[in-house]
């Protein structure tokens, strides 16, 4: 069992030093707006044929024009905005901003109802909030993307409220049943010109509208603390949770459970593995069709970013990645490489305790084993409950990963 969990670089003295350093940085844990990068112009988007081939993971600190590199945290905020724009442009489609005067919100008992009014159309989101039986409002909140696959006990024991984002209210695509089809989803009524979008941009948009509703009503009405909101999900919803957390800076903590390819795993690395979800073998209802056309097979090296940079969009906020190497399709070796590359961003600003990964075997898909409870509990305690002494320096992977999947050749920076 120790070998299956082994490779955890947590040293008490280092932990204490990092805690002290992180507390002195003054770098925010969360923001009060969806997108701090809205003030920056989008970078110039090269056509796919104009993009250079880069076989290693692109340097997340180098700006899109290749002329500047991030040296200070303030520069990261602009670079972060560039990465977000690139992912939307080449991969998932546009996530439109919505002015607050287009949001109407109300509570019906414990159910949050949000009406989004755009282009003469109205889209309504409804979801109940499950409040703690004890504790004092305003409460921290964990939102499950599609559902909450993590054990409810972890939240109930900590007086954390729970909610589910029902993504079908925005885009009802599913690998089962009969979805409406691209161009015919609820989102498309409001944005008929964005039918090239993949589901992940639209789901991230809908998730943000729930946060708009909570923010507009305020804690006096919702009993929710907007500074202590988390999002989680597993499998395809693990990807969803990652996109939601990455693209909304009001999220203090993202826990992406077994997100697989198209989530935290890097497209470039996944292409070198076996039977895994990669850019050529994924569900293109989730992404722009042009992603495969422009970057399939060896052309993946032309992507101006990779998913270590999607992961890094969460910085400076908190992120925990959970993996399960028993399922080859999930491409956890690729997530391991991607996670260690992304970690460099948090490390650069002295806040590496805000990012962790735990890749543990011997359990079912989306079934968090008791052996992973401590990692989840630590992140909940620190980033939703404010317990600064919680140990979140989590770096757990199978014992053979460091040698078999050496991160260094992937990072030429």
Identify the residue ranges that each predicted region occupies.
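Cap/lid segment of the alpha/beta-hydrolase catalytic domain
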Residues: 144-227, 260-263, 267-269
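Gly/Ala-rich beta-loop-alpha elbow adjacent to hydrolase catalytic centers
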Residues: 233-237, 241
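Alpha/beta-hydrolase-fold serine-hydrolase catalytic core, especially in secreted/extracellular enzymes
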Residues: 23-126, 131-137, 315-317, 324-413
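Conserved hydrolase catalytic core segment
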Residues: 247-252
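Bacterial Sec-dependent N-terminal signal peptides
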Residues: 1-25
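Mobile cap/lid helix-loop segments that gate and shape the active-site cleft of serine hydrolases
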Residues: 256-310, 331-339, 347-352
